[in-house]
Amino acid sequence: MKLHEYEAKELFAKYGVKIPPGRLALTPEEVRKAAEEMGPPVVLKAQVVVAGRGKAGGIKVAKRVEEAYELSKQMFGMNIKGLTVRKLYVTKYLEVEREMYLSLIIDRATRRFLFLASPVGGMDIEEIAKTTPEKIKRVYVDPFVGLRDYHVRSIVSWLGFSPGTAQWQQAASIVQAMYKIAVDYDAELVESNPLALTKEGDVVPLDARVIVDDNALFRHPELEKALEEDPRDITEFEAYAKKIGFHYVELDGDIGIIGNGAGLTMATMDLVYHFGGRPANFLDIGGGASREVVREAVKVLLNHPRAKVIFINIFGGITRADEVAYGVKEALQAAGGTTKKIVVRMKGTNEELGRAILAEIGVPLFESAEEAAKKAVELAKL
């Protein structure tokens, strides 16, 4: 479960970390009220649980109350990496002396917690990691030993603070709080980027991210409730798929994928990659899917803005090929046709009947998955 920034900052505050003043807003009017209460300048931050929202236009600075109001009208409803902005977090703008990076993850190879710290941070941290990896310090913490003072000293000194200063103590408190959050909330990631030294001399997390292990949510009923009320990182297609009853994951390519069974669907994606294409999604209709489920699955990809081609790969055991074919036919009829190309490979139960149905509507059928995948990639490049 990915927490929104405002939720992550509430956790930081719960563990004694000083955070910048902020208000959650659901409407432009609430943004205006928050800006009036805090006084400009303020920062408007889109609450979507993806990295890189700043570069995508999801963070804006407003120097006047009315500017905050007008900017918020532009930001509400915008799409950032497939997610619609429905909440804005309005925070007080702080003058920053220096930006740093600090995160805590789980290193599964060593079965230990791993702190990553850098005296430089911000939107370009990925580039920094690539070009100057020596600026990032790695500090491992054995969970059976716990976080010790020597761990904290190593991290805080690397961030550039001197022992005995107020900044040292603030940074140390943040390190300790992040570790406690990770342990108490079964977190897979606790991050502040940027962690900032303000011109007033305070060390504060300007941004905060927390990802909680989904398998541990039963231990955190308050988070389960929050997830039910706000699905957060589920796209509109994923939400619709969940409602219908098939498994769907959004990806960034242009070839729509439909398969029956997770293994076959993933193998289909691998074939697309093998021939130089990129899947737009993972969509598993499951075993024994009816024509209604197939119809809705095809409709999802017909409406997908990036999917140029729809590649359907079916092995019919308990899934009947004629039901799949009827589902494709009904989806196309409901849409009034499509300019998207559809490629089908279908083997198994009632295969001949399914072939005949697809032939009626002019959908090509391929003998092998490799041949079909290659054709799908070729069509996507046209």
From Swiss-Prot:
ATP binds at residues 45, 52-54, 94, 99. It catalyses: succinate + ATP + CoA = succinyl-CoA + ADP + phosphate; GTP + succinate + CoA = succinyl-CoA + GDP + phosphate. One of its GO terms (biological process) is succinyl-CoA metabolic process. Residues 9-240 form the ATP-grasp domain. Its cofactor is Mg(2+). Transmembrane segments: none annotated. PROSITE patterns: ATP_GRASP, SUCCINYL_COA_LIG_3. It comes from the Archaea. Belongs to the succinate/malate CoA ligase beta subunit family. This is Succinate--CoA ligase [ADP-forming] subunit beta. It comes from Pyrobaculum calidifontis (strain DSM 21063 / JCM 11548 / VA1). The lineage of its organism: Archaea, Thermoproteota, Thermoprotei, Thermoproteales, Thermoproteaceae.
